Every structure is written in C-alpha cells, then in structure tokens.
Amino acid sequence: MKWEKKHSLEEKVEWRGLPEGDMQPFKAYVNEKTPGVCGTYAAACLTVLMAKREGVVTQSMDELLKGMEASIEYALPYRGTFYWDVQRGLNNEWKKYGYKTHFNLFSEKVVPGLLEDGVPVVVGTTAALGSPYKNHWLVVYQYAYDSTGKLWYKAYDNHGSITTVIPAVQTLCALWIEKL
C-alpha cells in the first residue's frame, strides 16, 4: 500500500453539516502558545457550539479556555494532548448537564452521521497518516464527498482558520457529546 501524503480538493463539492456562519465567532480565537494547546481550543469550541445547540447555559469561550486548559493540557505529566485528555476536559464540563463525551477511533465512521444530526465533532489529525498538521485537534462542522468518493472535512483550526479543509484519511479519531 502506498501512502498518499498530499491531498488537495480541487473540485467544487456539496458541503453538508452546520452553517459556516456558526463558526464566525471562533475566527478570533487563535492558539499562540508554545507548545500549543489545540486540544483545549477544540474542546472549548465544541462546548460553545453544543451549548447553543442544546440550549445549555455554559461559560464563554474565554472562560472555557482558561478553565479547560489545566484539565486537558496539564493534568498528566507528558507533553501533547491525547484523545483521553480532550475527553476528560469535555466530561468535566458536561457531566453537570447530563452529557457524556463519546469516542470513535475512525472518524469517517461517525462524522457524517453526527453532522447530519447537527452535532459538531472534534477530530485528531496525525502525522502517521501524512497530515501536514502533524498531530493536531480540529472541530469539524461540515463534510463532503468528492467525485471519487473521498471524504473531506471543513473545520475550525485554532491556528486562525474557520474554513480549513482536510481529507478524512488523515484523521484518526473523533470525539463528540451526547445526552446521557
């Protein structure tokens, strides 16, 4: 099997999922820390979007970033953010409202269905699958299939974009929130 590292979406596709306008407030949230705290930004963004969807009153994005950083990025003595770190931060915030974070190793199995239901999803990109982002967390809000059947995601990237397009084959896991 030959790993294809470069992927580019060079055709017009039909994006499905949440309205792009829902992501506009997040354009101002750029992760400038070194090392980055992308898991915290993704979890906070997902929380704001789900709070709006579910009618739950939670904290502001700024308050969430402050509060979640310690529980996601620094709770355990290693560098980097694994899915269980993001999951822990989300569960800490959402358990009081009767919600739980779910996880699937293969994002392409769950993301289209969740987005059809209006549920945004945190996905992890990985260097092992050729992602130019290396290991990074994004919030996916739209998906599309190209003419060859390849699945693509449109996402909030906390490096400053709300319209990042990535191929699903460069992601390894998905996290989302559901009512218990």
State where each predicted segment sits.
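Conserved active-site-adjacent core of cysteine acyl-enzyme catalytic domains
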Residues: 65-180
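Active-site-adjacent structural segments surrounding the nucleophilic cysteine of cysteine proteases
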Residues: 1-79, 146-148
